Amino acid sequence: MSVGRIRYDWHTAEIRAVYDMPLLELIYQAASVHRQFHNPKQIQVCKLISIKTGGCPEDCSYCAQSSRYQTEVKPQALLDKQTVVEIAQNAKQKGVSRVCMGAAWREVRDNSQFDRVLEMVKDVTDMGLEVCCTLGMLTTDQAKKLETAGLYAYNHNLDTSSDYYSTIITTRTYSDRLNTIENVRQTNVTVCSGGILGLGESIDDRVAMLQTLATLNPHPESVPINILSQVEGTPLEDQPDVPVWDVVRMIATARIVMPTSDVRLSAGRARLSQVEQAFCFMAGANSIFSSDDNKMLTVTTPCPDYDADQEMLNLLGLEMRPPSQRPQPVVMGNS
């Protein structure tokens, strides 16, 4: 099997063969692909701001923000623009180059709250930062409004495979998620879409999710790999921890099948040691989320702080990546 070329015709069996490689060989192959398409010394450090917290009507089994579960999350109204701008300014001073604004909504609605989000996007973009939003489902017209405001990326995760999906979520279909990604693709906004490990899914489910992403043309420019943090009060509170080598395998496989994408070591990173994170970077992860206040990433997962991350990057000889110019999606025929 050849690696290191962009293709959109991956079969599930091929991806499973990649995932099942002997671990050190898999890491080596992924590292080789990573060096071919990316600067291996650079890691993008991102900051997530929960601009509207809790009270979500959906039933995602892993999420502390669902109104259906009794968790410690206290609903919080949409933040004011000045607060968001101040958080982003502080993050930029720490070396952050990408800010992700998350709202616990099922879908975007054309109302005054969306208008306020558009203003936030414009002001933070004007600071020279990449801005990503995760606001739920949206239409093409709404995506175009976000594009006009300067949005760099829109996040809409698949979470898991299409077969396992209904076990985790019943209030939104897999097709709904793919349709939102397609709506974003009608603009120049880049796509961020990945999944979560530890939902009770099988290896086949993980591989199937990657196959769905890797057969999108173009590939998502950003592929977050999240690790479940069990939240008391949610249906998945008793799920076992994900073995770190499963995380490394998933990152390496994503890197090989989607060579140009940023693979983001996202939620759940706080429980990984520096050594374990180093293996993730070797396997092709080139982005992390960091914070200055140890508040919750997406309100469910502790986020490492800037100082600890800077120390780790220095130790590993890595540097923070500056903001990117908006890339043009890589669209090619199957090869």
From Swiss-Prot:
It is an enzyme of class 2 (transferase). Binds 1 [4Fe-4S] cluster. The cluster is coordinated with 3 cysteines and an exchangeable S-adenosyl-L-methionine. Binds 1 [2Fe-2S] cluster. The cluster is coordinated with 3 cysteines and 1 arginine. Its cofactor is [4Fe-4S] cluster; [2Fe-2S] cluster. [4Fe-4S] cluster binds at C56, C60, C63. It comes from the Bacteria. InterPro entries: Aldolase_TIM, BATS_dom, Biotin_synth/BioAB, Biotin_synthase, Elp3/MiaA/NifB-like_rSAM, rSAM. The keyword S-adenosyl-L-methionine applies. Residues 41-269 form the Radical SAM core domain. Pathway: Cofactor biosynthesis; biotin biosynthesis; biotin from 7,8-diaminononanoate: step 2/2. [2Fe-2S] cluster binds at C100, C132, C192, R264. GO terms for molecular function: 2 iron, 2 sulfur cluster binding; 4 iron, 4 sulfur cluster binding; biotin synthase activity; iron ion binding. It catalyses: (4R,5S)-dethiobiotin + (sulfur carrier)-SH + 2 reduced [2Fe-2S]-[ferredoxin] + 2 S-adenosyl-L-methionine = (sulfur carrier)-H + biotin + 2 5'-deoxyadenosine + 2 L-methionine + 2 oxidized [2Fe-2S]-[ferredoxin]. CDD domains: Radical_SAM. Its EC number is 2.8.1.6. Belongs to the radical SAM superfamily. Biotin synthase family. HAMAP family: BioB. NCBIfam families: bioB. Homodimer. This is Biotin synthase. It comes from Trichormus variabilis (strain ATCC 29413 / PCC 7937) (Anabaena variabilis).
